[in-house]
Amino acid sequence: MLRASSVLPRGSWHEPAADVVVLDYDARHRRRIRMRGVRGLDFLLDLENALMLRHGDAVKLDDGRLIEIVAAPEHLVEITCPDAAKLAKIAWHLGNRHLPVEFAGTKLRIRYDPVIASMLKNFSARLREIEAPFEPEGGAYAGSGQDHHDHSHGEHTQGEHTHDEAAEPHHHG
């Protein structure tokens, strides 16, 4: 089976792709998985570390051909506010819940979640459900190959929490 072991960032490659894979946000965070392109090309994605594949990236096959990465449309909520301070407050609350957030100019985008949508309405946010590719920020550790930082909160969901509840003291940044 053909193997893809390297990623070429968007804009760094110009030759035609041999095939295309269309993946949602979760499916683009991979290290090793068998994939099939839309034209039927089977290959093994076999990266050294798990990383976030971005829309427009390409993975390079052992034989030199490229497979283009396309971000699939997803059910999202686009968030706007009457002023920047309210939008910043909302961004803080979303970050405190460790939710991936896409910054789109003066709008925020998150994956649709009815509980989070209800919370945002309480902050006087304007919400619009859309179908679009989801390209959230990589986070403070994205440059080092990680998309999320490690620390233990014990068992919890991504709901409301404070870091005072953490199993061990820790700091961000």
From Swiss-Prot:
Gene Ontology CC: cytoplasm
Keywords, sorted A to Z: Chaperone, Cytoplasm, Nickel
Main location: cytoplasm
Biological processes annotated in GO: protein folding; protein-containing complex assembly; urea metabolic process
Biased composition (Basic and acidic residues): 146-173
InterPro entries in UniProt: UreE (IPR012406), UreE_C_dom (IPR007864), UreE_N (IPR004029), UreE_N_sf (IPR036118)
Protein's UniProt name: Urease accessory protein UreE
Function, in words: Involved in urease metallocenter assembly. Binds nickel. Probably functions as a nickel donor during metallocenter assembly.
Subcellular location, record wording: Cytoplasm
Domain of life: Bacteria
Region (Disordered): 136-173
A Pfam family this chain is assigned to: UreE_C
Stated family: Belongs to the UreE family.
A GO molecular-function descriptor: nickel cation binding
